[in-house]
């Protein structure tokens, strides 16, 4: 399993059969917003917890061109594929819209 360059990952302390979690931030945030509490919390409870930086956010920096929700959906689907097994997607604010669109493409 490779780690996408725009993801923060906290591995489960003990291996379980639980699906990995992929957190998607809202506008004006990045993967970092999940890392102080949420990722360690779920990793301690047996989940591999991932958070993706959508393009133009977080460690990725400012986007040079216009970025659409469809671009963000592509980022989430790419991260979900790189995880290696289907994750549970969790989004906050704008991230929830991205998650809804991503889920509609996965079905």
What are these regions, as identified by a protein language model?
Residues 2-12:
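A short loop-to-beta-strand scaffold at the N-terminal edge of the catalytic core in hydrolase folds
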Residues 86-107:
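Conserved hydrolase catalytic core segment
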Residues 37, 75, 98:
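Short Gly/charged-rich anion-binding patches and loops
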């Amino acid at each position: 399993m490779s780690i996408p360059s725009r993801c923060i990952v906290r591995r489960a302390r003990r291996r379980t059969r639980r699906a990995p979690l992929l957190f998607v931030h809202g506008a004006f945030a990045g993967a970092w917003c999940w890392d102080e509490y949420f990722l360690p919390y779920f990793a301690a409870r047996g989940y591999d917890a991932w958070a993706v930086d959508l393009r133009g956010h977080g460690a990725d920096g400012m986007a040079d061109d216009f970025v659409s929700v469809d671009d963000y959906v592509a980022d989430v689907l790419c991260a979900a594929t790189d995880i290696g097994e289907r994750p549970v997607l969790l989004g906050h604010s704008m991230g929830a819209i991205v998650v809804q669109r991503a889920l509609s493409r996965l079905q």
